[in-house]
């Protein structure tokens, strides 16, 4: 049985994620707030979900240290703030959008990174397992005012999804099992969110 940690960045959506994961796995997952767990304790877990949250990654307790410590060792999925933190941990910048997305459904385009990943690291499974069986374009729920910037985007990351304005909506590491989504798979505004989470939990 995989041990799952939901790393809670003090967000009201965290328990929606927890309930979705527990529904899929039929097992309890552990939830710790970002300043209520020791960094070494995180080593007990196989898969880590970095929850959404208010503010910026550097204000979120152990969020950035966790990514820097465990990206090469653990399977990590970042959602919203968690996704932004993954970008930032590897050197990306964040930009503040003029338009705030709060409970807005928009289309995202999935970018095929399988070939790029296979070339970079033939031993790694295809980087887009997260989107396995999902259409190339899908509707997602968004609650954010910041995005990972394309300018200076780290060479060790891939962009896996974009919105209609070409903003980054998904990313993955080229060699580590680390992925992020700017949108909320646990939201009712993301009809295929459960399928996406099933893909990640099965990988």
For every predicted segment, state its role.
Residues 37-45:
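Short amphipathic alpha-helix with an adjacent loop that forms part of the alpha/beta core around
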Residues 75-77, 93, 139, 158, ...:
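Proline-centered loop/turn at the N-terminus of a beta-strand
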Residues 188-203:
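Acyltransferase
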Residues 117-175:
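Catalytic beta-strand/loop cores that center a nucleophilic Ser/Cys/Thr
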Residues 45-133, 197-199:
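Cysteine-nucleophile active-site neighborhood
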Residues 1-5:
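Extreme N-terminal starter segment of soluble prokaryotic enzymes
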Residues 27-36:
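A short beta-strand-loop structural module common to alpha/beta enzyme folds
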Residues 18-26:
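Two-component/phosphorelay signaling modules centered on CheY-like receiver
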